Each structure stands twice: as structure tokens, then as C-alpha cells.
Amino acid sequence: MAKGEGNVLAQHKKARHDYHIVETVEAGIVLTGTEIKSVRAARIQLKDGFAQIKNGEAWLVNVHIAPFEQGNIWNADPERTRKLLLKKREIQHLADELKGTGMTLVPLKVYLKDGFAKVLIGLAKGKHDYDKRESIKRREQDRDIRRVMKSVNRR
């Protein structure tokens, strides 16, 4: 876990399988009161989510935050678009990277840091099927090598 990263509430585990993560950026999320209560209860799904930049602002799209059970009329739409809090320089850098390169912004994890909800956004390029097979093959080979080295070291 990176320095300052507190309690991880949600992870997009398949993101590293489906994408080559080039760079990561930490961003704050603008949430309503009932949404932060649901996030603290770890009722958030990042699976279909992505981030986009519109008019110089970063937005988190398709991230599902379940309605808070005691929220009643104050609950917001679970799939609403949420604003990300980034510095203007960071937004400009990400916008430059996204222009015409086949890159996308993918939420990797949501966690609490000093009481605030943060999202780790990855600048990613999609993997092809053969890239995924290569990753699996490489992981299996590394596992076999570790297994053999472990048995050799025991002798």
C-alpha cells in the first residue's frame, strides 16, 4: 500500500488485466452526504467506470455507489457523474495524454485518506487478447521459477 493510502474500500481488480497502466493519479471525489456514507460502508463498484475530461474538468462516469439505506429522499442517483478534484496542471497533462492516442482513464481503487474519499485513476491503454495471454504465460513462468527456487533453497 502506498504511503498515506488508508483503508481501501473498492478495487477494480480486472483493470490491470484488461489495460496497460501507464501512469496513476490520485484525485478527490465530490460526493453528497449519503454517498460518502455508502462509500465508507464499501458499497461502491468500479467495474464499468471510467473518467473523462470535459471543459477543463475531470468527471467520474459509470461508477455505481449504492443508495444509503437510511438516506431516503436525500439519496442521489447511484450512477450519476461525479466531479474529480485535480489540480489544473494535472487535468491539462491528462488531457494532453488522452488526445488521439487510444488511452483512457480508469479508476483503479477507492480509499479513505485523512477522512476524505480518494480515487486512484490510471492512464491506461487497452490490451489485446494476445497481450493478456502473454501476461498470463509470464505470470505462470514466474510462479514456476519461484517454486523451483524455493525447493532448491530448502536443500
UniProtKB/Swiss-Prot annotation:
PANTHER family per the UniProt record, alphabetical: SSRA-BINDING PROTEIN, TMRNA-BINDING COMPONENT OF TRANS-TRANSLATION TAGGING COMPLEX
Localization (cell): Cytoplasm
Annotated family: Belongs to the SmpB family.
GO terms, biological process: trans-translation
InterPro entries: SmpB (IPR023620), SsrA-bd_prot (IPR000037), SsrA-bd_prot_CS (IPR020081)
Function: Required for rescue of stalled ribosomes mediated by trans-translation. Binds to transfer-messenger RNA (tmRNA), required for stable association of tmRNA with ribosomes. tmRNA and SmpB together mimic tRNA shape, replacing the anticodon stem-loop with SmpB. tmRNA is encoded by the ssrA gene; the 2 termini fold to resemble tRNA(Ala) and it encodes a 'tag peptide', a short internal open reading frame. During trans-translation Ala-aminoacylated tmRNA acts like a tRNA, entering the A-site of stalled ribosomes, displacing the stalled mRNA.
Record-given protein name: SsrA-binding protein
Keyword Cytoplasm: yes
SUPFAM superfamilies referenced in this protein's UniProt entry, alphabetically: Small protein B (SmpB)
Record gene name: smpB
Key words of the record: Cytoplasm, RNA-binding
Keyword field contains Cytoplasm: yes
Pfam entry (one): SmpB
GO cellular component: cytosol
GO molecular function terms attached to this record: RNA binding
